[in-house]
Amino acid sequence: MNLIPIAFDSLGVRSMATCLEARGLRVMIDPAVSLGPRRYGLPPHPIELDRLNTTWQDVRGLAESSDILIVTHYHYDHHNPNDPDLYRGKIVYIKDPKNRINFSQKRRAHYFLSRIEDADIQIADGGEFGHGPLTIRFSQPVYHGTGNRLGYVIEASISCGEDKVVYTSDVEGPAMDDQVTFILEESPRTLILDGPMTYMLGYRYSEEDLRRSVNNIIKIICNTSVKTVVIDHHFMRDIGYAERIPEVYRSAEDAGVRVLCAAELIGRAPDLLEARRKELYRSSPVGEESSKQE
């Protein structure tokens, strides 16, 4: 399979938009992008807004030419209700909009689904689906993070022959056992992982959450067929991310497993625009009127 990371936090936007191609089929997972509305008390810098616009065009272009779209939950960095044409006539696997879902996501799901009625919508939770050479499996809903405050997400496994990719969606770690179970059972060759939310360490993410996440990632490295772990999203909102999980990097090196972010996977340097927002405002000041408009 050909794996194309389109939009990720290491590429300057909030997203995990991923495209997979195999034998003439194209699958797009979570075709959406967004920006953190406030960071360090600052709105997105114009450089971030430019990146958002250019990246969305990339996502949209690949999504339009995809056969299958997957929506793992209803946050705006994972689905886009404002571009319903994107979904028209496509098979769309979605997180169940009525069960194991919090109020905010249920409301967003209702609006989203009212906009994409021309799509072939399939509830994905816990399901398995075949498309020619591809098999797509979904986990049961797992926490978005370490509790139910932000609702639930579904993890996805896509396989073609001996090649398999697991996409975790927003597990923020993974710190919880049931988030890890699906990964261990699927034993992918490539894991696209939403890593620990260390930029909130001590606030909405505890040292214990980080410890559990590190142990779980090491467990995955040591007990599956994984050869590449793409760790990104929440993890790449921390400018000091590389210093947070030294045990993971050591275990991966010992096991011959690559651990890297999406930008590095495609040969680019990480571009953590949100984490560098204060720096952006210092190096490229924004006029007072522009700031107010944001």
Swiss-Prot record:
Disulfide bonds: none annotated. Signal peptide: none annotated. Transmembrane segments: none annotated. PANTHER family: UPF0173 METAL-DEPENDENT HYDROLASE MJ1163-RELATED (PTHR43546), UPF0282 PROTEIN MJ1629 (PTHR43546:SF4). HAMAP family: UPF0282. Belongs to the UPF0282 family. This is UPF0282 protein Mthe_0376. It comes from Methanothrix thermoacetophila (strain DSM 6194 / JCM 14653 / NBRC 101360 / PT) (Methanosaeta thermophila).
